[in-house]
């Protein structure tokens, strides 16, 4: 039940603050990418993701890396920096106010975020390749982490 912080790097890699922070954000999205791989195997496809929560407070950064991890465009609205309680409140409002046959996606698109300003980032081939390389190393490093537990 105790966490073990683990930072691994290759001897030939450059240890810099930028690379360290990128690794932190990539790691935050690595488990999501693994889950999305399972969904792909089940023939579930994503068209776009909406980024919401504290990780998106700084515009563009986590959004760009999430787009690379998911392989789909990511839109962040003006309210993207609001976190979990905001999302829970939206789910509660949906349960209370939804119309017959109205999906959560429809409710959010037409009644909550209609007219909200946002930015969409499409994953670049270079970012996708960079994340794929990270994810391959991440999967390998999971064995080392398991050995420590």
Task: Describe every region a protein language model picked out.
Residues 1-149:
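Glycine/Thr-rich phosphate-binding loops that ligate phosphate moieties of nucleotide
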